[in-house]
Regions:
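Active-site loop/oxyanion-hole signature of alpha/beta-hydrolase fold enzymes
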Residues: 47-87
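Short loop/turn positions at the edges of beta-strands in beta-sheet-rich folds
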Residues: 10, 20-22, 78, 88
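Conserved HGGG/HGGXW glycine-rich cap/lid loop of the alpha/beta-hydrolase fold
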Residues: 12-57
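Helix-rich cap/lid subdomain of alpha/beta-hydrolase
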Residues: 103-131
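Alpha-helical elements of Rossmann-like donor-binding domains used by nucleotide-donor carbohydrate transfer enzymes
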Residues: 2, 34, 65-72, 92, ...
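N-terminal cap/lid segment of alpha/beta-hydrolase-fold proteins
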Residues: 1-13
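Conserved beta-strand scaffold positions in the cores of enzyme catalytic domains, especially
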Residues: 6, 45-47, 104
Length: 131
């Protein structure tokens, strides 16, 4: 079940959905509805509505600004170092998020479960205490 919440950050009420329990995984696209598929169990997913999209009011921002907003969300929500899956507009944030020290994976055109399972099968994702 998706649970909606918001975080007041940089003068904006950033709206997000949270689904599940487990290690945190952040899903970033224009809005939470860009992730319609069923999400796998065993993770705590955070699905953001970026400013100017979905339920988050505010001006649309440049990718660099959005990356700082996403990084601020991670810090304020005390998520540690989650994997950030990107789709749509989120893909433009990838290089900026990496420059800020976040770990990103593209997820355009594939199911979240497929992205996570393919990376897990190659041992590229540490789901232990190092998230």
């Amino acid at each position: 079940m998706r649970r909606a919440g918001y975080l007041h950050l940089y003068g904006l009420n950033l709206v997000f959905d949270r689904v599940g329990k487990g290690p945190p995984v952040l899903l970033v696209a224009e809005e939470a509805s860009r992730w319609p598929e069923a999400l796998p169990e065993g993770y705590a997913f955070y699905l953001l509505d970026l400013p100017g999209y979905g339920r988050t009011e505010g001006p649309r921002m440049a990718p660099e600004e959005l990356a700082h907003l996403v990084a601020g969300f991670v810090v304020m929500m005390n998520l540690g170092a989650p994997w950030v899956l990107l789709r749509g507009l989120g893909l433009a944030l990838g290089p900026h998020l990496e420059a800020l020290g976040l770990r990103v994976l593209p997820a355009e055109g594939v199911e979240v479960a497929e992205v996570l399972s393919s990376k897990l099968s190659y041992g590229n994702i540490d789901l232990g205490g190092n998230l």
